[in-house]
Design a protein with these regions (language model features):
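An N-cap/entry alpha-helix motif that binds or orients negatively charged groups
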Residues: 11-16, 27-28, 55-112
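Cys/His-rich microdomains that often coordinate metals
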Residues: 35-36, 54-55
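N-terminal alpha-helical interaction blocks
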Residues: 1-17
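Short cysteine-rich clusters marking metal-coordination/redox-active sites
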Residues: 29-32, 48-51
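Cleft-lining beta-strand/loop regions that shape enzyme active-site pockets
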Residues: 109-190, 197
Length: 284
């Protein structure tokens, strides 16, 4: 007589297969390899409760966590990218845009508008890396420029939260023009003696970092964000030299004065409000 019996393999006693678990219910943290429930991440502003690793946040999540509840008003939602170059590849530019619009619920890689932060009126633009690596095309550049110009006209601060792989190759020179356009709008905002707070998140690179992301009166970054122009691999292959430890991280750049302060995501809202009040009556 068998001492041990195999568990039943059929009927109602069958174990739930791994494939029956909803996709995305759990996330493995790249920082500590712990498995974290999606609900726990949402409640913790997408910060790992074990090691404080900062997962990517959507533009909508960032606005909800920073601005006063119900105060955000979106601007320029009708702007759409066009395939002026008729770009051809493994997929057309139009097809790629449609794919990311469906997966993110966004029209393009930035969400812009205005609202209040601890009662302070602000204009805001937030990049979303989930949309084509938050590359900057003509719509992204135009929406950011209009957000800046709205802030200047209303004499309120502008906050830009960056995360980007750089200029959008599908739009060629039109994407590169946005670097000058956004920078020009910020120069006029500065001439009006109005505050601009730039927040760098992981990753902020290339044309975005070389333009508006690095022009803030106050530049903050989330911990361990990758920040730079070209990637470390490209630089190493070009220079044939080993790079310093921590090269192109927020901590490395803070030590050298490019970043004013590294701020944990859960402390961003009060820290931004503190800086805006410090920067003078125009921010109040």
């Amino acid at each position: 007589m068998a001492i041990f019996k195999k568990p039943p393999t059929g009927g109602g006693g069958e174990r739930k297969r791994r494939s029956d678990i909803p996709e995305g219910l759990f996330q493995k943290c790249p920082g500590c390899n712990e498995v974290v429930h999606e609900i726990e991440l949402i409640e913790n502003q997408r910060v790992c409760p074990h090691c404080d690793y900062h997962f990517a946040q959507s533009a909508k999540e960032r606005i909800e966590s920073l601005l006063d509840t119900g105060s955000f008003v979106e601007m320029d939602a009708s702007l759409h990218s066009v395939d002026s170059l008729r770009f051809q590849g493994m997929a057309t530019y139009k097809d790629r845009l449609k794919k990311y619009q469906e997966s993110t619920g966004l029209i393009d890689a930035v969400l812009s508008g205005y609202g209040t932060l601890e009662g302070i009126r602000v204009a805001i633009a937030v990049m979303d890396f989930a949309f084509l690596a938050a590359t900057m095309g003509s719509v992204v550049g135009e929406r950011i420029t209009r957000a800046i110009e709205h802030a200047t006209a209303e004499r309120i601060p502008i906050i830009i939260i960056s995360a980007s792989g750089g200029a959008r190759m599908y739009e060629g020179m039109l994407s590169l023009m946005q670097m000058a356009k956004t920078s020009g709008a910020l120069a006029r905002h500065a001439e009006a003696r109005l505050p601009y707070i730039s927040i760098l998140t992981n990753p902020t690179t290339a044309g975005v970092m070389a333009s508006y992301a690095s022009l803030g009166d106050i530049i903050m970054a989330e911990p361990k964000s990758m920040i730079g122009f070209a990637g470390p691999r490209v630089i190493k292959e070009t220079t044939h030299q080993d790079l310093p430890k921590g090269f192109q991280t927020a901590e490395f750049l803070e030590e050298r004065g490019l970043i004013d302060q590294i701020v944990h995501r859960r402390k961003l809202r009060p820290k931004i409000a503190e800086f805006l009040r410090f920067l003078g009556p125009a921010a109040a």
